[in-house]
Amino acid sequence: MPLSLFRRLLLAALLLVIIWTLFGPSGIGEELLSLSLASLSPAPASPGPPLALPRLLIPNEKACGGPGSPPFLLILVCTAPENLNQRNAIRASWGGLREAQGFRVQILFLLGEPSLWHPTKEPHDIDLVREAAAQGDILQAAFRDSYRNLTLKTLSGLNWADKHCSMARYILKTDDDVFVNVPELVSELIRRGGHWEQWEKGKEPPRAVKAGDKEWEERPILKSQPMPLLYLGRVHWRVHPSRTPGSKHQISEEQWPPTWGPFPPYASGTGYVLSASAVQLILKVASRAPPLPLEDVFVGVSARRGGLTPTHCVKLAGATHYPLDRCCYGKFLLTSHKLDPWKMQEAWKLVGGSDGERTAPFCSWLQEVLGILRCRVIAWLHS
């Protein structure tokens, strides 16, 4: 084959890959398309009656309190009582951060009760109380912890955030097998919020510190302005309910009649961000939504009833698992799914460790140019 023809074919193949990346499934084109959803949304439904949620066994009401500014980002991690190794891996890695880009970050683990028939239920209960006392990051509600109760778990967490952490600017809901690049996520939220808010480095001391006191440090000052609505994640489009008997994703025709068609667009439950105002809106209309056991679908349905549409973000991995790669995890990805405790800590080492410092760039110049495309190719080859 002549060299010139080979180069043309290579260039054509590269262009096709770039076009697929931009406008294929979960590409930047899809992110732009999601911006048009707001104009297609129905009028918001009127608020429904208050939600009937299970009582909190470990309420942890003061988790967002304490000295200093309120959390900029509250992270709610859905976990199971027996998943202690996953929780400890998160605490020892990205969940150990209490500040990112100068703003406070708070993490809480959401869980229910061990199954009544579980042979180790009572020891689990005792261990959870001890863990909660030692760590201060547990939020437990009185329901049987199972996949089909994820909606109860998530709503309990969002309701807690609205009541006891209402000053948090954003809430991330995620799972205990998901790696979160907290510094990059905070930077992403600052960039997206920059259209409506002003973020400044200032020398304004906290109220408890007298003017002229040199003991306080320069910190970003968040001006008090109205929060815009934000529902950000890996958006799923035109998903039809599964009718497969016995499937954990099964939705009956009574729960979602065939005449309703596909689900409205919703963000993958592996990781989505809601502004505080979006949380309030969803809680107001959630009691009018059909009681679906799939929490990410339920949140999407509730958001739509409130007139809120999800915004697609290509950096949120959804259900995709990305193999460990310093450039992808440190620069381009905000989340990655299906990481066991060992991989969780290895990923944290790749992106800088507990101090967040690094001596070399995350990516070479070529990796920077290829960007998220390279990460997707790696994930595809790995799968």
Curated annotation (Swiss-Prot):
- Give the E.C. number(s): 2.4.1.62
Specify the protein's topology with respect to the membrane.
Single-pass type II membrane protein
**Regions of this protein lying in the Cytoplasmic compartment:** 1-8
Lumenal compartment ranges equal 30-383
> Where on this protein are sugars attached?
149
Q: Could you tell me which pathway this protein works in?
A: Protein modification; protein glycosylation
Picking any one GO molecular function of the record gives: N-acetyl-beta-D-glucosaminide beta-(1,3)-galactosyltransferase activity
Q: Does the keyword Lipid metabolism apply?
A: yes
**Annotated transmembrane regions:** 9-29
Q: Does the keyword Zinc apply?
A: no
Q: Quick one: where is this thing mainly located?
A: Golgi
Q: List the disulfide bonds.
A: none
- Compartment list: Golgi apparatus membrane
Q: Which family does it belong to?
A: Belongs to the glycosyltransferase 31 family.
Q: What is this protein called?
A: Beta-1,3-galactosyltransferase 4
